[in-house]
Amino acid sequence: MKEGKHFVLVHGACHGGWSWYKLKPLLEAAGHKVTALDLAASGTDLRKIEELRTLYDYTLPLMELMESLSADEKVILVGHSLGGMNLGLAMEKYPQKIYAAVFLAAFMPDSVHNSSFVLEQYNERTPAENWLDTQFLPYGSPEEPLTSMFFGPKFLAHKLYQLCSPEDLALASSLVRPSSLFMEDLSKAKYFTDERFGSVKRVYIVCTEDKGIPEEFQRWQIDNIGVTEAIEIKGADHMAMLCEPQKLCASLLEIAHKYN
């Protein structure tokens, strides 16, 4: 068998490495190495959201992993939801270490606008009531106000997990932690350049039944920045790795085969 690839799975806001528990063994059974990491203040990471100021602070575990790779080692990055923003930072700093960056129903930044652009567009195009019982709370200081975000049970059930099993929803409900979109940081920054971020091959996986980041917005992002390839998982809600793990695995195996 051909040498297996190394997949690095990057979870979305309020989630952790645990969200990949169905996908990880499938990729490993196909001969690949899989790292499903916890970002800062996520999963079992001991930091609290109140300790984080910037997207970079939040992304640190991914940056440390990329830094630790040997000079000739390359990975396939998979970012889910807000995890697409973390991918952006890794692509900018380590483009030579990435075979491809896979955006799974994710926010996908561009190198033209401010780093907050796609999140601002999402907020403009998505009615505020779509957030349901998600809590947005201030933290930080008066000089540096920040906002945390915590998904409520209704938002999880109706916008993210509506096609998942009751067990997966129960698991998520017990494990989600407060997170942030880091809008205050991103709106002041231009983290992504065409020369570095833009040089990495991008694959977008569209989830057709997603009510969190709707298909229409996923496709708008693809049109906004362009991708090497777009793949569709029909019948997947926002949590494709839980409701359609076999289909997602098949798509990722195809990507592993194709991007060398």
From Swiss-Prot:
- The positions flagged as active site in the entry are S81 (acyl-ester intermediate), D210 (charge relay system), H238 (charge relay system)
EC identifiers of the protein: 3.1.1.-
Regulation of protein activity: Esterase activity is down-regulated by salicylic acid (SA) or by tetraFA, a synthetic SA analog.
Q: Does the keyword Isomerase apply?
A: no
GO molecular function term, any single one:
lipase activity
Q: Which Pfam families match?
A: Abhydrolase_6 (PF12697)
Q: Which family would the database say this protein is a member of? A: Belongs to the AB hydrolase superfamily. Methylesterase family.
The protein depicted here goes by the name Salicylic acid-binding protein 2
Species of the source = Nicotiana tabacum
- The protein's gene is named SABP2
